[in-house]
Structures are given as C-alpha cells and as structure tokens.
Amino acid sequence: MGRDQVSHKRSQNSNVSEIPDLDSSLHRSEDTLVAEIIEAMTLAGVCVVRNLFTKSLVDQVLKDFEPHVSSTKLFDGYPGNGCHLTGLLSKSEIYAHMVVGNSVFEKVRNHFLSTTFRSWIGGKMMTFTSPPQLDSTICSYINPQSPGEHLHRDDAIHYGWNEAASEYTVGRDISMSMFLALTESTRENGTTRFFPGSHLWDYSQDFPSADDTRIRYAELHPGDCYFMLSSVTHSSTDNRSTNRPRVLAATIVTRSHLRQEENQYLTYDPITVGRFPTWLQRLVGYAPSAPFLGWVDKRDPRCVIDPKAADDHCGGEYYETNEETLN
C-alpha cells in the first residue's frame, strides 16, 4: 500500500461504527434527551431519535402536504420518480409550528450552529451571538423503483471544507438537518445511508465506495427523526420496493451570519426587481450560486420575477460540466 493510500485510509478512520439510537419516550426530561443527542452527534455526526413526534401529528402533516404533491416534481438532475415538495411553512401550519418549532430540535441546532463573535466598538470589546436560521424545508416523496443518490455532503452548497480531525469541535459545521419520517423509511424503500464518524473526515479525499462495510442505514418509523450534521457523508438509497413510497420531511438550518447585510428581498418588491437588467437581478441575489444555492421551488429565482426567464442552472448540469479530479 502506497503512502497516499495509507494517508487516505487514516483520514477516513472512525471511532464509531454503530448508529446512535435514542427513544424520546424513555427520557425523564427534555434536557437529558438533548444532552444525549448532542453527545451522540459529537461522536458520530448523526443521531436517530425515536417517537419525537406523534402519529396524529404525522397524519396531519401528510394530509396538509397531499394537495400539493400531484403538481410537484423532483429537483432537476435527481434520479428516479416522485417529488420534492418545498416551501413547507406555508403548506402546513402544524409542520411550521410543531416540527420546525420543536424545542428539542431548537436546543440541538442552537448548540451546533450558534455563532459568537467579539469585536472592538467604541473602545469596548462587544460580544455578539447569532442563532441559526432556517435554510430550507423539503419533503421528499420517493416512489418505488427509484434509484438512490450519489454519496455527498450537504455543506457543499455553502462551500464547506474541513481537514481530518481526531475529535469534533463546535464551529466545524455550517448547517445541520432534522429528517422526520412521515412513512416507514427502510433499506428496502430508500432510506438514508451514511458513514458514522464521517463528520471528522478529510474533505480532500474521495468518498468510499457505496458498498463499503462501514455504511449504516437510518431506518425510521413514522414520527422518528434522524438528526445529521452537514459534514456527514450520506445519500438516499434505491427504493427497491414495489408499493412503498418513502416520505421524509427535511428541516435544514444554517449559520445565520451567512446572509446579506441589507435584506435585498424585502427592500425591493418583485415588480421593481423585474425592471432591473439581468446582471443587476443576479447581483441583488436573484440567481443561484453553484452548485445550487438560492433556489425557489427548485428553480432559478429569476423565474419568479420573470416567468419567461429560462432556468440558468440546475444541479445535474453543473456536476456534468464542471467535473474535476482531485489529486
């Protein structure tokens, strides 16, 4: 084995091989549950939390989403069939208030993604803390016989880049997700696969093969959740079932200082922006950042202010035309 191969292997070593799995119904206090989730994610980058939401909540969220499913499609470049439903806050009040607003999720995301900064102002050292912001909401309906995704990290859209680390420190991650199972989510019908401990890996190294023995699967019942840091190597898997769609609602949050100083989207109304030349619309923020950051309903935001505008970009086209081999 050559030196580069040895280095690669070491940079993808992990001290954890199993899935941290907690049952929220067995914890006597919320703070104890939160502490154990944080401990698990610090070690493995992920944590499965059972029974975080009730069956009645899951049923209501599914009912709220259902009228929107037939008119929705998948992200461009995404394999298989089904749909990605976005903008979930306006589609389900119970999702907005009870899922996004869940206090366990709030405490976990605040731990990993709150940013504290100190600066001299007027002769005084001031301290500022910025809690995370909502990044996106996506409910994935993946139908039977749909292929899975390629392995990836979710922080690629924010250009996350880390070296290998022997232990986790807060500040390493840009974002995190909570996936709520709205149906059974299993290896057979396309649940998420991931590498425990991959949040500590070297980003300059390619991903292992999809049949690597270290891969684990987040198998969930309705109401269970899968928490994941954006530095974790993961993907959806093939839905090999014949009659079992897999439905997961993802709530993604990111560090809130990753935004413009002046809120361009409320400062100028869409009609005014529609009169701007294309270059100015893009400068204001009405354009996606590659690979695909800043979309509206899975499309270039210029389509909102000008329905005749062609999409400038989709994720699949970007990956096909900008391939690079890292040495």
Swiss-Prot record:
Metabolic or biological pathway: Secondary metabolite biosynthesis; terpenoid biosynthesis
The keyword Lipoprotein is assigned to this record: no
Record-listed E.C. numbers: 5.4.99.-
Catalytic activity: fumigatonoid B = fumigatonoid C
Signal sequence bounds: none
Region Disordered: start-end pairs: 1-22
One of the GO BP terms on file: novofumigatonin biosynthetic process
Key words, A-Z: Iron, Isomerase, Metal-binding
Names of the cofactor(s): Fe cation
Enzyme class: isomerase
GO function terms (MF aspect): isomerase activity; metal ion binding; oxidoreductase activity
Keyword Isomerase (UniProt): yes
InterPro entries: Phytyl_CoA_dOase-like (IPR008775)
Disruption phenotype: Completely abolishes the production of novofumigatonin, but accumulates fumigatonoid B and asnovolin A.
Binding site for Fe cation: H152, D154, H234
Subunit structure: Homodimer.
Homology family: Belongs to the PhyH family.
Purpose: Fumigatonoid B endoperoxide isomerase; part of the gene cluster that mediates the biosynthesis of novofumigatonin, a heavily oxygenated meroterpenoid containing a unique orthoester moiety. The first step of the pathway is the synthesis of 3,5-dimethylorsellinic acid (DMOA) by the polyketide synthase nvfA via condensation of one acetyl-CoA starter unit with 3 malonyl-CoA units and 2 methylations. DMOA is then converted to farnesyl-DMOA by the farnesyltransferase nvfB.
Protein's name in the database: Fumigatonoid B endoperoxide isomerase nvfE
